Amino acid sequence: MLKQSGHKHGKLLKILKHNKPKERKFGKGARRCERCGRYDGIIRRYGLYLCKDCFKEVAHELGFFKWGE
């Protein structure tokens, strides 16, 4: 991106301003995993906001356990 702006600070700011992602209010794009930043498989119950993989790693520390085992 610096090559495109020609190392000019004003041009770099303009490029960053017009290419930043839109802030989402609804849908999958509005929610991210708080640990890794993924958008897929978010567990929102109890206000966790963790993806399924991160939840599986920290579930026991949070007090969740599997009934069968």
Swiss-Prot record:
Binds 1 zinc ion per subunit. Keywords: Metal-binding, Ribonucleoprotein, Ribosomal protein, RNA-binding, rRNA-binding, Zinc. GO terms for cellular component: cytosolic small ribosomal subunit. Gene3D superfamilies: 30s Ribosomal Protein S14, Chain N. It holds the Pfam family Ribosomal_S14. GO terms for biological process: cytoplasmic translation. GO terms for molecular function: rRNA binding; structural constituent of ribosome; zinc ion binding. Its cofactor is Zn(2+). Coiled coil: none annotated. NCBIfam families: PRK05766.1 (NF004424). HAMAP family: Ribosomal_uS14_2_A. Belongs to the universal ribosomal protein uS14 family. Zinc-binding uS14 subfamily. Binds 16S rRNA, required for the assembly of 30S particles. This is Small ribosomal subunit protein uS14. It comes from Nanoarchaeum equitans (strain Kin4-M). The gene is rps14.
